[in-house]
Amino acid sequence: MSYGEIEGKFLGPREEVTSEPRCKKLKSTTESYVFHNHSNADFHRIQEKTGNDWVPVTIIDVRGHSYLQENKIKTTDLHRPLHDEMPGNRPDVIESIDSQVLQEARPPLVSADDEIYSTSKAFIGPIYKPPEKKKRNEGRNEAHVLNGINDRGGQKEKQKFNSEKSEIDNELFQFYKEIEELEKEKDGFENSCKESEPSQEQFVPFYEGHNNGLLKPDEEKKDLSNKAMPSHCDYQQNLGNEPDKYPCNGQVIPTFCDTSFTSFRPEWQSVYPFIVPYGPPLPSLNYHLNIQRFSGPPNPPSNIFQAQDDSQIQNGYYVNNCHVNWNCMTFDQNNEYTDCSENRSSVHPSGNGCSMQDRYVSNGFCEVRERCWKDHCMDKHNGTDRFVNQQFQEEKLNKLQKLLILLRGLPGSGKTTLSRILLGQNRDGIVFSTDDYFHHQDGYRYNVNQLGDAHDWNQNRAKQAIDQGRSPVIIDNTNIQAWEMKPYVEVAIGKGYRVEFHEPETWWKFDPEELEKRNKHGVSRKKIAQMLDRYEYQMSISIVMNSVEPSHKSTQRPPPPQGRQRWGGSLGSHNRVCVTNNH
């Protein structure tokens, strides 16, 4: 290849640099760079990078605009070596794009960096996009480099290329090897034994005064092999240790996957005492209570809760056989219930006017407990268990206990319909109404002078049914005031009955005009309005038990004739009871 020369002249900082090539053939393995002389000389030089030195090849003569009609190529920036500085980083650098430079005919010396940037396929990719003409000759130049045809530098480049390729392969091999090792460690960790971590409540400070060091792996293996032999160290086992770990002179021996050794416990060695938080756990929910219903002492006071304590020990726990006098059953939030966590033996007044004796009352069920743990309520988990236990007992007692239902409402409000619905849910129930006193064989005849006798007669019938254990006992009266229901509630809680208050859910139950139309006994609107003025909306057992009968209603009345039959029939003919409204 022949040399070509381009004459150049410095025309100024904004003049264009033009060149006219003498030969258009250019190898892709060489790089041409145009450097500006920073000493303000009037020429540019084209240098070729061969090895580590820069060798000047040609001198560019910078001409004026007179060469524009020839085949010229504009140069806009100075192309510096790529590993030193990228094009465009300096404002005074002019990059030569597609400039053709004549080179020597002999094969040039090619540097390793140039080869990697331009021709190596093993490298990630070129940093800059090679010119189009260099792309055409890329395959041929790569073959020259790999085969080393008549070029000692090509052989060296091939060796260096192979060495770099091998280094990359080695790095990849090491990378994948590390990944495999990490995966193996992960699998081994998943397959290893997972020892459960003990809770903070289980730790017992028996390490005090000992050295809390861990055995070395060799000592662990030796100790594992000698576990079946008698040991001279003190054998200590308690709840504070982690599962299947044994302390020996203050040292903890971790167990292995094979649990056959951990279950071996020498019987000839002393065992450390079993230590738990203060107070043993509560008995399970399925312990039995020997409850004797309706077996209270003869003629008990109706305002006192009585219970007999007959405690016995079973499996280390106190289990009480409660002979209970069912004296109270309330759902009112004002009632006071004692807690088992406090040992109370005195008499405490309750919200319903009654007094309760001994420790625990829940929905009319008096439970006597000889032992109560003082720290029971302080323990979160035990408190939850106690709450579940109490709730379970309440639900069970709600099903087992007898029920007294007191209906309330003005005449025509729908009490009769509600009583039939409740009676239909349990055919063993019975309905009592004061209006039954005024029903005769020839029809209903109301007499206001007999109203007191009618109430006494109805209360006696209800008491007989409660004594017989009938449930539910439904009282279908207006019951607009609390004192009217007090006799029924006293008898019911004295026999351990639950007491509930029900009102019909009708939109007209407080509308005198509509009630006048709907009641069956012709009660006037004026009378209904007067009853509505006396109606007590809030009702509970405590309100009933604290109520007082008005003075004008407390006059002594003679008992009604015992042999007198009503339309509703006797107590045995409750299936034919006619449910009516009370005035």
UniProtKB/Swiss-Prot annotation:
GO molecular function: enzyme binding; transcription corepressor activity
Record's keyword annotation contains Lyase: no
UniProt cross-references to SUPFAM superfamilies, sorted A to Z: P-loop containing nucleoside triphosphate hydrolases
Alphabetically ordered keywords of this record: Coiled coil
Coiled-coil residues: 162-197
Positions of the UniProt region annotated as Disordered: 549-575
GO CC entries: extracellular exosome; nucleus; transcription repressor complex
Domain of life (superkingdom): Eukaryota
GO BP annotation list: blastocyst development; negative regulation of hematopoietic stem cell differentiation; negative regulation of transcription by RNA polymerase II; positive regulation of hematopoietic stem cell proliferation
Protein name: NEDD4-binding protein 2-like 2
